[in-house]
Design a protein with these regions (language model features):
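Short pre-active-site segment immediately N-terminal to the catalytic Zn-binding motif
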Residues: 80-95
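Post-HExxH zinc-binding segment in Zn-dependent metallohydrolases
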Residues: 108-147
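Short, low-complexity, Pro/Ser/Thr/Gly-rich segments in the mature regions of secreted, periplasmic
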Residues: 146-156
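Short, solvent-exposed mixed-charge patches
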Residues: 1, 156-157
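Auxiliary, metal-adjacent structural segments of Zn-dependent hydrolase domains
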Residues: 2, 12-77, 84
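Stable alpha-helical elements in mature extracytoplasmic
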Residues: 39-43, 92, 96, 116, ...
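Sec-exported extracytoplasmic/periplasmic mature domains
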Residues: 48-52, 101, 105, 125-133
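Active-site recognition of the HExxH zinc-binding catalytic motif
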Residues: 93-107
């Protein structure tokens, strides 16, 4: 059984869920300008270092360059990314993992409002903590700590 071309109808979501539950992995593709493809490689290397690449390939088919806002496109199992947003590989990798968690929740039929964003942000923080522990690069460790501090800041007293 092939992964559905789109994940929109009840039947398509059911098919996607069955496949992911049985270990299906996408051949992740990056679509965009050569500059975009090159810039996406950095966060993907970090995702591989942290051991999250299979998680990404389970739920996301494509990372596509767009001119607008970066976002998850559930019906395409795609992350749309603006090349101008690709300035911090650790933050970008966290964004990709956060959107992957949202796609997982969508396929599993979990509510994608209310608590979904909390789950996705927790997954992002978990990823950054894991990357910090698994990398041997002191510069990446330092940036992970800075990124974690940013995510753990309390905006209100």
């Amino acid at each position: 059984m092939d992964f559905p071309e789109r994940v929109y109808t009840k039947e398509e979501v059911k098919q996607a869920r069955e496949l992911t539950e049985n270990g299906y992995k996408h051949d992740l593709t990056i679509k965009g300008s050569p500059k975009f493809v090159a810039k996406v490689e950095d966060p993907l290397k970090l995702i591989k270092t942290a051991g999250y690449y299979d998680f990404l390939r389970t739920y996301i088919k494509v990372i596509r360059e767009i001119g607008g806002l970066s976002q998850l496109r559930e019906q395409e199992a795609a992350i749309w990314f603006n090349v101008k947003a690709l300035d911090d590989p650790i933050d970008n990798a966290g964004f990709i993992i956060q959107k992957t968690q949202q796609m997982k929740d969508f396929i599993e039929g979990r509510l994608y409002y209310e608590t979904a964003e909390i789950r996705a942000v927790k997954k992002r923080i978990e990823f950054i903590e894991t990357l910090r522990k698994k990398t041997d690069d002191p510069g990446i460790k330092k940036k992970c700590i800075e990124n974690l501090e940013k995510w753990n800041e309390q905006p209100f007293p």
